[in-house]
């Protein structure tokens, strides 16, 4: 199983107070591209999605701020407020695989995380920002793979799966 994660940062030009930006960026950048790639690889190996006949996947991870995610949330979900994570799946998982899926990686979609909101939530939960970012990434990943939480029971199932995924990775190593 192979997963390629394309990571983008969109924080540097924003109107976040400079002291907050400096601290948040320092913490967020503790998770290197190699670490993100390793985490997603572990998560995929655990989840064993069977979408791609060649077991090769791609996804994008955008780490941004509240203003950018609020714009996306307003545009696509008609909720004009920031949120912690959005996931935009490329696939309709009810579709039949095409011949192209036998030749190329399956593009799952995009996960967008507000580092600004993640930092606030990490502080409220009293854990490091990298742990919160990993938690939100697992939530977005599960959405890309077809998970949803329309009921309290489904939300609990999803949260339990997120905890399993977090336990597979050494999140604390990213904070040292």
UniProtKB/Swiss-Prot annotation:
Its EC number is 3.1.-.-. GO terms for molecular function: metalloendopeptidase activity; RNA endonuclease activity; zinc ion binding. Disulfide bonds: none annotated. Its cofactor is Zn(2+). Keywords: Cytoplasm, Endonuclease, Hydrolase, Metal-binding, Nuclease, Ribosome biogenesis, rRNA processing, Zinc. InterPro entries: MetalPrtase_cat_dom_sf_prd, YbeY, YbeY_CS. GO terms for biological process: rRNA processing. It is an enzyme of class 3 (hydrolase). Binds 1 zinc ion. Zn(2+) binds at residues 139, 143, 149. It holds the Pfam family YbeY. The keyword Hydrolase applies. One of its GO terms (cellular component) is cytoplasm. NCBIfam families: rRNA maturation RNase YbeY (TIGR00043). Belongs to the endoribonuclease YbeY family. Single strand-specific metallo-endoribonuclease involved in late-stage 70S ribosome quality control and in maturation of the 3' terminus of the 16S rRNA. This is Endoribonuclease YbeY. It comes from Acaryochloris marina (strain MBIC 11017). The gene is ybeY.
